[in-house]
């Protein structure tokens, strides 16, 4: 492991204000992710998990505190620089795959490369490689409507990894799948972690799946618990 964290957040706070009323969604959240680490953050709906992920990915800005990615403070980056970082260095997986319905699996996976300026032939070749890595080489010409739920999520995983990111942020990646497909997706994440050295931060309410990660933290009422009391509970 590196001497420096891959990503670090320091005293992150997020407050939503409406008139005289305010809601503190995150309160002084601090932790670090090491290169190649598999980390899960568990918590119930409304605990602040998704908000935290948005801040870590530069999709939203904290009220106070700081996110540092490979030595760069996201607070200091322009919107354009944040977009470039997300496209080139971070991957995202969501509960609902967010695939473009009119494009094939191959075209969906190639999209981040094309946005980043890759030549179409190079983008398609890399997209083919990633679809093969997730077991969908023979489904590359199918559109999302022609794929099962598990297959669509595999396409989304391939898309998240096509730029060889150091870190993938996954928001309830198995929340829309049955148990068999959920198990398959988590097994795949573990395989890709070993094969490519990609770090994964997964937020989930599924305790059994969270146990498969190398480290688990708990989000409770906007605060991060570094001693996980929920894992192992019935």
From Swiss-Prot:
Localization annotation: Cell inner membrane
Keyword Cell membrane annotated: yes
Membrane topology value: Peripheral membrane protein
Main location: membrane
Superkingdom, natural source: Bacteria
Residues at which ATP binds: 43-50
Subunit structure as annotated in this protein's UniProt entry: The complex is composed of two ATP-binding proteins (LolD) and two transmembrane proteins (LolC and LolE).
Similarity section: Belongs to the ABC transporter superfamily. Lipoprotein translocase (TC 3.A.1.125) family.
Function: Part of the ABC transporter complex LolCDE involved in the translocation of mature outer membrane-directed lipoproteins, from the inner membrane to the periplasmic chaperone, LolA. Responsible for the formation of the LolA-lipoprotein complex in an ATP-dependent manner.
Protein name according to UniProt: Lipoprotein-releasing system ATP-binding protein LolD
Gene giving rise to this polypeptide: lolD
């Amino acid at each position: 492991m590196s001497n420096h964290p891959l990503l670090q957040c320091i005293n992150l706070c997020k407050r939503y204000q409406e008139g005289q009323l305010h809601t503190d969604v995150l309160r002084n959240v601090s932790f670090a992710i090491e290169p190649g680490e598999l980390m899960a953050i568990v918590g119930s709906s409304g605990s602040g998990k998704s908000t935290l992920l948005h801040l870590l990915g530069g999709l939203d800005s904290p009220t106070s505190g700081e996110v540092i990615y490979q030595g760069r403070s996201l607070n200091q980056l322009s919107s354009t620089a944040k977009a470039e970082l997300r496209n080139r260095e971070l991957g995202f997986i969501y509960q609902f795959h967010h695939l473009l319905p009119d494009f094939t699996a191959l075209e969906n996976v190639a999209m981040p490369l094309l946005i980043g300026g890759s030549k179409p032939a190079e983008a398609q070749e890399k997209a083919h490689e990633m679809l093969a890595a997730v077991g969908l080489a023979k489904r590359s010409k199918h559109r999302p409507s022609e794929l099962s739920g598990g297959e669509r999520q595999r396409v989304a995983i391939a898309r998240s990894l096509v730029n060889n990111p150091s870190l993938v942020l996954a928001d309830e990646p198995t929340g829309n799948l049955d148990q068999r497909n959920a198990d398959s997706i988590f097994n795949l994440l573990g395989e890709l972690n070993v094969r490519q050295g990609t770090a994964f931060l997964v937020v989930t309410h599924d305790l059994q799946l969270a146990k498969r990660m190398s480290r688990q933290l708990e989000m409770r009422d906007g605060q991060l618990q570094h001693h996980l009391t929920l894992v192992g509970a019935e």
